[in-house]
Amino acid sequence: MKNTTKPCRTEHHNAEGQRDRMEGNKKGETKAKKSVACSHCKKRFSHKAHLQIHMRVHTGEKPYRCDQCGKCFPYKQSLKLHLDIHAKGNPYTCDECGESFKTRLQLRSHMTLHPKYKPYKCDQCEKSYGREDHLQRHMKLHTGEKPHKCEHCGKSFPMRDLLRSHLMVHSEVKPYTCDQCGKGFTLKKSYNEHMNIHTGERPYTCDQCGKGFPYEQSLNLHMRFHREEKPFTCDQCGQSFSQKGAYNIHMKIHTGEKPYTCDQCGMSFRHGYSLKLHMTHHTGEKPFHCDQCDKCYSTALFLKNHIKTHDKAQIYSCLTCGKTFNQLRGLRLHEKRHSLTKPFMCFDCGKCYFTDTELKQHLPVHSNERPYMCSLCFKSFPRMGSLIVHEKTHNGEKPDCRTGSKKSQDE
């Protein structure tokens, strides 16, 4: 039967009802030309009414309210599904473990925890999926295939939904605004994760060491340390990195590139954070305050290192010697020192080390290379560890440091 529904030109609530009825009518849409496009994510629709309903995703509008619990929804159908929860309790039960859920979607999400519901396994990273097409989509991450290209900046993505999320970056509309700092966001997830910074909440927790993170991406990067993944390797010295950002920073050591210039004194830096740290030398700004004492610091890192002096809780203990550590990573590195073997040997002097990282840090001693420079006084060091020890001297009064290419004593 032909649909003869006509748009209402008079009352707003009738138009609302009609749009929701049209939302469920998919038959005509599959045949009709999708001529109306969303200005935010470029998704196309065959009717303007469908586009207006879709816009609620970006505006956050939720006109349908549950009169039992006050929860609001963008669509009438979503409210109907929600009302079933109040009426039925937990009607959906898992056949494997007997746990019950309020919605079918929650049950389906839970079922993926049982191994037999994830038969499609990735042979490269051991991840499992309940559907073959999900595995195929995941495999693009390993093959490097990125068929979905942004027409604005040329950036490519392995999956269409990642492209859609990226397109929001080019949109000037940012419907989600932080009421504490005024920063705007195109995606609600980005807004929610940003709010974790203000609240101090860290909902993404590592299941191996218990460390929490405000961002999901931060947890994903952290997990590479546990898996000992270092996919980014320098082709000049062989050093590997778990994060691309760290790799890019390292490469500037070989190229000598210093793109960040101070507009006060003309000094140039390899890294943006080094310039930012240097600028506090001109301004004298120390915005990071310790809430346990009256000390102030120019960077969050200096404050973080200082706070550790107040924290007496040592969590991880060495079973061999009893030494304690704040981080599990520190304990694991320490435990290697109880081994009788030092498999990494320097061919110039014969000195041996427990890890390849220690050997790589030692090698610049023979080449007179001093790639690690203090961004405050420009003293240079052959090893990162020496630089870190030196930078701690800037936490208090600035020492009388010499700059330039003069050699510094790091032993």
Curated annotation (Swiss-Prot):
Entry GO terms, CC: nucleus
Residue ranges of the region described as Disordered: 1-33
Superkingdom of origin organism: Eukaryota
One of the GO BP terms on file: gastrulation with mouth forming second
MF terms in GO: DNA binding; DNA-binding transcription factor activity, RNA polymerase II-specific; RNA polymerase II transcription regulatory region sequence-specific DNA binding; zinc ion binding
Keyword tags: Developmental protein, Metal-binding, Repeat, Zinc, Zinc-finger
Transmembrane feature ranges: none
InterPro entries: Znf_C2H2-type (IPR050758), Znf_C2H2_sf (IPR036236), Znf_C2H2_type (IPR013087)
Amino acid composition bias (Basic and acidic residues), ranges on this chain: 8-32
Name this protein carries in UniProt: Zinc finger protein draculin
ZnF segments: C2H2-type: 36-58, 64-86, 92-114, 120-142, 148-170, 176-198, 204-226, 232-254, 260-282, 288-310, 316-338, 344-366, 372-394
Expression sites (tissue/organ): Specifically expressed in the hematopoietic lineage during embryogenesis; first expressed at the late blastula stage around the blastoderm margin. During gastrulation, restricted to the ventral mesoderm, the presumptive prechordal plate and the dorso-marginal cells of the organizer. At the 3-somite stage, strongly expressed in a caudal domain (marking the erythroid lineage) and a cephalic domain of the lateral mesoderm. At the 8- to 10-somite stage, caudal expression is in two bands of lateral mesoderm which later converge at the midline.
Disulfide bonds: none
Keyword field contains Metal-binding: yes
